[in-house]
Amino acid sequence: MYNYKLNVQAEEDLARIFEYGISRFRIIQAIKYYDLIFDCFSRIAFNPFLFPEAFRFREGYRYCVCGVDTIFYRINNNEVEIMAIIWRQNY
């Protein structure tokens, strides 16, 4: 299993998603979705090569669809760096 970390952009994306969830769906649903995203982070860390490469986004990146969002990440040695969480992409 790899360790994972969020870069600044991904942290901002996560905050935006949570705030949107609260305003649109209320706190309980926002927390459930927030937990789902962290479950996706754990799945990525468990086997980061399981998910496809994101050639159209950036070379060396991979992605994982999580709910209506797409998590973009890259693998650096024994660590996964979560780069961005983007809303509704077609891949």
Regions found by a protein language model. Name each.
Residues 1-55:
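Basic, Lys/Arg-enriched alpha-helical interface segments
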Residues 40, 64-66:
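Generic recognition of cysteine residues
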Residues 56-63:
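Short, hydrophobic/aromatic-rich segments at coil-to-beta transitions
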